């Protein structure tokens, strides 16, 4: 994988002759960052043409990475230099929250965060967990709700109660085959706060395969990633 990543990064680096700003999955849930670091070092050793490669640990996954890329693009369009953009965007992950729930607890059990028995009983009782990214980029269980509607409403509450400067923010909603639920969450958010924009999308295949069908996440900037914990 590192060799393949190195070749791909090298092709972009040589062909486009541009600086590269790369947003990785949280390095505490994936080897993505370390693989990218190996690839970047190999590319620079092989064909350093004066262009820069900078890596940012998103402390997130899915749309958490995507929002960072969008904000970075907007900074560039405003005339900021590559290093100015990179230096600024590196401060964002510490405030970019990713909070999510899953449709079936068996997917949490597969990660080792629950036993199979607990997952089975939880599904029978319609227990819905809320998980979040910790300040260090680990996935931690945060709260529990009873029933699908209750957990969706709690995601809305967490976003609306912890978001900062919402009128200048883009918030993200990512889901795995839960489009109607995503529309409900967005509707409830808009009833409570005014935001600059909302992105509603499906999970990427990698994240989606880990969290399973009917999973749904919200992403937003807060003062930190603690959410009152």
Model-assigned labels for residue ranges:
Residues 11-16, 43-49:
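Short, charge-rich binding segments
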Residues 26:
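Active-site pre-Tyr helix/loop in NAD(P)-dependent dehydrogenases
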Residues 29-32, 36-42, 48-54, 60-70, ...:
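Mixed-charge interfacial surface used for oligomerization/domain docking
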Residues 19-21:
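Structural motif
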Residues 2-13:
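Single conserved hydrophobic/aromatic residue that forms the stacking wall/gate
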Residues 23, 56:
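Hydrophobic residues at beta-strand termini and immediately following loops
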């Amino acid at each position: 994988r590192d060799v393949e990543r190195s070749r791909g990064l090298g092709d972009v680096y040589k062909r486009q002759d541009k600086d590269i700003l790369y947003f990785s999955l949280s390095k505490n849930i994936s080897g993505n960052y370390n693989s990218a670091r190996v690839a970047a070092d190999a590319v620079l050793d092989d064909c350093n043409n004066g262009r820069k490669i900078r890596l940012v640990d998103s402390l997130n996954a899915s749309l958490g990475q995507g929002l960072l890329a969008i904000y970075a693009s907007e900074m560039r369009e405003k005339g900021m230099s590559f290093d100015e953009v990179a230096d600024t965007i590196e401060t964002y992950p510490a405030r970019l929250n990713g909070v999510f729930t899953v449709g079936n607890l068996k997917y949490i059990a597969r990660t080792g965060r629950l036993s199979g028995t607990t997952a089975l009983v939880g599904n029978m009782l319609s227990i819905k967990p809320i998980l979040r990214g910790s300040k260090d980029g680990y996935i931690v269980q945060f709260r529990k709700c009873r029933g699908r509607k209750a957990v969706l409403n709690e995601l809305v509450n967490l976003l609306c109660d912890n978001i900062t400067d919402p009128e200048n923010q883009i918030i993200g909603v990512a889901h795995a085959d839960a489009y109607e639920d995503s529309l409900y969450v967005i509707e409830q958010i808009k009833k409570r706060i005014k935001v600059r924009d909302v992105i509603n999308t499906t999970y990427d295949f990698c994240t989606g395969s880990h969290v399973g069908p009917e999973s749904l996440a919200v992403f937003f900037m807060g003062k930190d990633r603690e959410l009152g914990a």
